[in-house]
Amino acid sequence: MLWDAIDLKLLLPLVCAGVSFVLYWRVVKNEQLKRYFFSRLPFDKASVLHLVFSKLFGFIVLGLIPLMICTFLLPEFSFGICSSSSPLVNSFVWAGLLALVIVPLTFHFSQKPENLQYYPQLRIRKWTYSTVLIYLASWAVYLLGYELLFRGILLFPLVEALGIWPAIAVNTLLYSAVHLLNSPKESIGSIPFGIVLCLITIETEGIWAAYLSHVCLSWTNALTAIYHHPDIEFIGNKSRD
């Protein structure tokens, strides 16, 4: 036979991931789209709306659409959304344990100048409480789609097709490659983090520990970067001039 069920479990997630990431980056990095926002609104408002659009678009293109396609063609998988044998509380326990490591490490490295070159991704000078909440919420939504793709679609079918460690290797390689778009150091740092998230996802049979851990890392990085960035002023409840 030229084609069997294993081929679909291996190729469909990889094709979905490749197409979705190309589409995502072409849209969010499109200069005409940026001009649409920035030519109609003041810089700060345009920056916030463009970031919110980018994160919502990422959730849809990286997570929701691939999930719909893969659920239709691979109905035997739940892709880590639910588990019949592992209680959800296990995911919260693992996420809590990981947070004990993630928070201090991220707090330490997020203050460094090389990190502040990239974060926070919203490059406005004056931040209010609402700006911070919008920024954190946008990241939480985006990361749900991101984890649906990496720890759901790109893990469970590959484990069945390749075995646990080959699947983790492929998953982590792709995960690290995506982070090259930010910086080589971030790409290297994503390797152990990606392996740990894959192992916990397999252990808990769900994406939720990985998702909560990733949100914890993202929010810690964001809040630390906002606080330490020399070009950012936090003005609380005050309105921008």
What does each of the following model-derived ranges do?
Residues 46-57, 130, 134, 162-171, ...:
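Membrane-interface starts of transmembrane alpha-helices
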Residues 1-85, 222-241:
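N-terminal, membrane-interfacial amphipathic/helix-forming hydrophobic leader that caps
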Residues 58-64, 142-151, 193:
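Core segments of transmembrane alpha-helices
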Residues 29, 165-178, 184-241:
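Functionally important transmembrane alpha-helices
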Residues 113-124, 145-170, 199-206:
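Membrane-interface helix/loop boundary segments of multi-pass membrane proteins
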Residues 11, 15, 88-96, 132-136, ...:
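Hydrophobic alpha-helical transmembrane segments
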Residues 64-73, 138-141, 199-213:
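Hydrophobic alpha-helical transmembrane segments in multi-pass integral membrane proteins
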Residues 36-48, 71-142, 156, 160, ...:
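Juxtamembrane helix-loop-helix connectors linking adjacent transmembrane helices
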